């Protein structure tokens, strides 16, 4: 008998050699029916995996992210099998699970159309009904190469040839179809109850623009058709909220072929941007941060010293000035370090909190660019805090509180992940353990639940990631808090302690918005372009019913401007209903409508974007009401 430790802390004894599915059945019949795989001692495995020793076991269902990945991965194989049944000459590349579903990259002499996707989806449903078993088998590397060459799959051959010579290569067979794959998978195709092919895009083989452009077919899968329908409705809503579409309609920003990945902000977009930055400055001033600004271009030697050259070079841009080599900064931290080093520091000076709205440049492949969400130039709201080791926990708690206050203002809920040491990192095991424990302790002290995200930390330290949940349930990773023992060592940072000796500070890196550009993109989609009054580019639109009120419109607008309210006037010779509809289309929070009666009574008629007609009131009362809404930053979605 062997001991199995379960997720809930309980232990059970089972016979040696039992499969994961058998263990699930011992726990409950309903669990065994829902099970898609398991995590055994930290490794994700399939249901047929045999257990031969004491271990920890967590059964995975579609409610678990890893469970979703298993089913999505199997769905990508079903897609590939359907394509090969219909078009045997098509060459297969890769087909992974992704956050919202799966895709498969294929090389075909023809273009896939929406009509062809329907045909492929129909064939996928046939394969699902057949409930074909997925069976794993392995071959030595040379045999695997020959096997794929015989199947005329050059992309698979290339992948195998990249593996070490002594590799054992795994494949999955489902009926007449075989694919190169490490797994895991569900036991049979019938588990993918509800599939949908969503779209087609171009993708360079291995993400390299010098390679052939393949066709990428995206899809998604669920266990229930009702869940698929809910997801498709969500996708329709997301399309309506697409920040690229709304950004154009509301005249907020544009992106041009002269600068792919470099957004142009229009006047109304700049109002939003400046409003967010002013709010950021106000919050940081109250939290005792000092704002700095550091250069965009710095000598290449600095990036060698910081470690960015070794760990981030592929994402950087470089230039020459005179005879020197320089880099355009991808991160702000080395600049903050130079400011810290500019003076002798005492323990009495710490914590030293430097905040910066720093413009950074990072190379992204053209296929990855996406509106404001994925760009090559953006403004990062960085702060770098230099603390003593004794102050780490207190300072991280203050940072978490600041981030929490920020997100509440916008009406966001969030969840937290703790990202641990990646493979490509620097520093000792001891430093990484100390930093990771420091973050865990801070999260425990503030009572925040969190998930561990293995291997996704920065190259210089572990981090806490804040994932915002928008009003239609999507999540966006924005804020981060990183604890860093490495940079202070590399740059020989110190402070004079109470004992008169030099000591090494610890560095905390953190962002709240993350990227201002991306945060604006998220807000556009979160609010569907209907920004709260305090953020809205135009807070009030004043309009007349006839030409007789034109001067009164100008008078009302002047008073609003004097009270720092953002206002536009509409005195066009158009019907008032048309003007109101247009203001609604532009998502202006308030409209002031002026006719003969309002002009005679020296008052105004107010209409709200949200509530409709509010009625007549004095201009003074309206200003008081609106200024209170703006000052309180009321942000109802």
Swiss-Prot record:
Q: Which Gene3D superfamilies match?
A: 3.10.20.30, 3.30.54.20, Anticodon-binding domain, Bira Bifunctional Protein, Domain 2, Threonyl-trna Synthetase, Chain A, domain 2
Chief location: cytoplasm
Kindly list the places in or outside the cell where this protein is found, as annotated in its UniProt entry.
Cytoplasm
**Class of the enzyme per the UniProt entry, highest EC level:** ligase
Domain of life, source organism? Bacteria
Catalyzed reaction equations: tRNA(Thr) + L-threonine + ATP = L-threonyl-tRNA(Thr) + AMP + diphosphate + H(+)
Alphabetic keyword roster: Aminoacyl-tRNA synthetase, ATP-binding, Cytoplasm, Ligase, Metal-binding, Nucleotide-binding, Protein biosynthesis, RNA-binding, tRNA-binding, Zinc
Q: What's its EC?
A: 6.1.1.3
Q: Which GO terms describe its biological process?
A: threonyl-tRNA aminoacylation
Provide the cofactor note recorded for this chain's UniProt entry. Binds 1 zinc ion per subunit.
Residues noted as binding Zn(2+) in the record, renumbered to the chain = 333, 384, 509
The record's section on CDD domains has: TGS_ThrRS (cd01667), ThrRS_anticodon (cd00860), ThrRS_core (cd00771)
Chain spans, region Catalytic: 242-532
Required cofactor(s): Zn(2+)
Function noted in UniProt? Catalyzes the attachment of threonine to tRNA(Thr) in a two-step reaction: L-threonine is first activated by ATP to form Thr-AMP and then transferred to the acceptor end of tRNA(Thr). Also edits incorrectly charged L-seryl-tRNA(Thr).
Which family is this sequence assigned to?
Answer: Belongs to the class-II aminoacyl-tRNA synthetase family.
Q: What is this protein called?
A: Threonine--tRNA ligase
Q: Which organism is it from?
A: Clostridium kluyveri (strain ATCC 8527 / DSM 555 / NBRC 12016 / NCIMB 10680 / K1)
């Amino acid at each position: 008998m062997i001991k199995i430790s379960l997720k809930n802390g309980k232990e059970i004894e089972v016979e040696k050699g039992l499969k994961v599915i058998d263990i699930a059945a011992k726990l409950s019949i309903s669990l065994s029916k829902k099970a898609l795989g398991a995590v055994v001692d930290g490794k994700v495995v399939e249901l047929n995996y045999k257990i031969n020793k004491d271990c920890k076991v967590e059964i995975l269902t579609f409610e678990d992210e890893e469970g979703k990945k298993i089913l999505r991965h199997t769905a990508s194989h079903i897609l590939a099998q359907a394509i090969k049944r219909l078009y045997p000459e098509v060459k297969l590349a890769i087909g992974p699970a992704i956050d919202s579903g799966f895709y498969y990259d294929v090389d075909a002499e023809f273009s896939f159309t929406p009509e062809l996707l329907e045909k492929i989806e129909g064939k996928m449903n046939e394969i699902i009904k057949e409930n074909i078993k997925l069976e794993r088998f392995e071959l030595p590397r040379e045999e695997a190469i020959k096997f794929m060459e015989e199947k005329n799959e050059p992309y698979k051959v290339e992948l195998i040839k990249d593996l070490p010579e002594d590799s054992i290569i795994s494949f999955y067979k489902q009926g007449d179809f075989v694919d190169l794959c490490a797994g895991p998978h569900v036991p049979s195709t019938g588990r993918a109850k509800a599939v949908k092919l969503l779209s087609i895009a171009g993708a360079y083989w291995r993400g390299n623009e010098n390679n052939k452009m393949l066709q990428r077919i995206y899809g998604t899968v669920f266990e229930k058709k009702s869940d698929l329908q809910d997801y498709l409705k969500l996708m329709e809503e997301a399309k309506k909220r697409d920040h690229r579409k709304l950004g154009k309609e509301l005249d907020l920003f544009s992106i041009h072929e002269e600068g792919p990945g470099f957004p142009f902000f229009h006047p109304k977009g700049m109002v939003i941007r400046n409003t967010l930055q002013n709010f950021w400055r106000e919050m940081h001033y109250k939290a005792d941060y000092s704002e700095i600004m550091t250069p965009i271009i710095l000598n290449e030697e600095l990036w060698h010293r910081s470690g960015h050259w070794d760990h981030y070079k592929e994402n950087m841009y470089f230039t020459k000035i005179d005879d020197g080599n320089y880099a355009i900064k991808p991160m702000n931290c080395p600049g903050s370090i130079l400011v810290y080093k500019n003076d002798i520091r005492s323990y009495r000076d710490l914590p030293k909190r430097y905040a910066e709205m720093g413009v950074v440049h990072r190379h992204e492949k053209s296929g990855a660019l996406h509106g404001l969400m994925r760009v090559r130039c953006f403004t990062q709201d960085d702060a770098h805090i230099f603390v003593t080791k004794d102050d780490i926990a207190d300072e991280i708690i203050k940072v978490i509180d600041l981030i929490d206050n920020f997100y509440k203002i916008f009406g966001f809920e969030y969840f937290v992940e703790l990202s641990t040491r990646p493979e490509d990192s620097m520093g000792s095991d001891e430093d990484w353990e100390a930093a990771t424990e420091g973050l865990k302790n801070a999260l425990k002290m503030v009572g925040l639940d969190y998930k561990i995200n293995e291997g996704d930390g920065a190259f210089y330290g572990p981090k806490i990631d804040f994932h915002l949940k928008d009003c239609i349930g999507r999540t966006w990773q924005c804020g981060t808090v990183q604890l860093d023992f490495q940079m202070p060592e590399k740059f020989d940072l110190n402070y004079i302690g109470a004992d008169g000796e030099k000591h090494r500070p610890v560095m905390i890196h953190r962002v709240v918005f993350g990227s201002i550009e991306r945060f604006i993109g998220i807000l556009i989609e979160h609010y569907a372009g209907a920004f709260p009054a305090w953020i809205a580019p135009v807070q009030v639109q004043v309009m007349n019913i006839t030409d007789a009120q034109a001067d009164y419109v100008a008078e009302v607008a002047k008073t609003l401007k004097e009270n720092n309210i953002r206002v536009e006037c509409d005195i066009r010779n158009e019907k008032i209903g048309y003007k109101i509809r247009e203001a609604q289309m532009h998502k202006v929070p308030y409209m002031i409508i002026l006719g003969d009666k309002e002009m005679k009574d020296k008052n105004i008629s107010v209409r709200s974007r949200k509530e409709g007609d509010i009625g007549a009131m004095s201009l003074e009362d309206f200003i008081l009401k609106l200024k209170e809404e703006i000052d309180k930053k009321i942000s109802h979605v």
